[in-house]
Curated annotation (Swiss-Prot):
It is found in: Nucleus; Chromosome. Gonads. The lineage of its organism: Eukaryota, Metazoa, Spiralia, Lophotrochozoa, Mollusca. Coiled coil: none annotated. The keyword Transmembrane helix does not apply. This is Sperm protamine P3. Keywords: Chromosome, Developmental protein, Differentiation, DNA condensation, DNA-binding, Nucleosome core, Nucleus, Spermatogenesis.
Length: 54
């Protein structure tokens, strides 16, 4: 159970939320494109963690 709690990454969820808010505030074309790339990288990291849990 302890391993599952660490794997959920409470810190990771908070960081992703802050990044999304910052993208919206900057919001001038270039910032949005960079934000989309960062979002895809985060999605891949989540998938790898889920495979490890299984």
């Amino acid at each position: 159970r302890r391993r599952r709690r660490r794997g959920k990454g409470k810190g990771g969820k908070k960081k992703k939320g802050k990044k999304r808010r910052r993208r919206g505030r900057k919001g001038k074309g270039k910032g949005k494109k960079k934000g989309k790339r960062k979002g895809k990288r985060g999605g891949k990291r989540r998938r790898r963690r889920r495979k490890g849990k299984k």
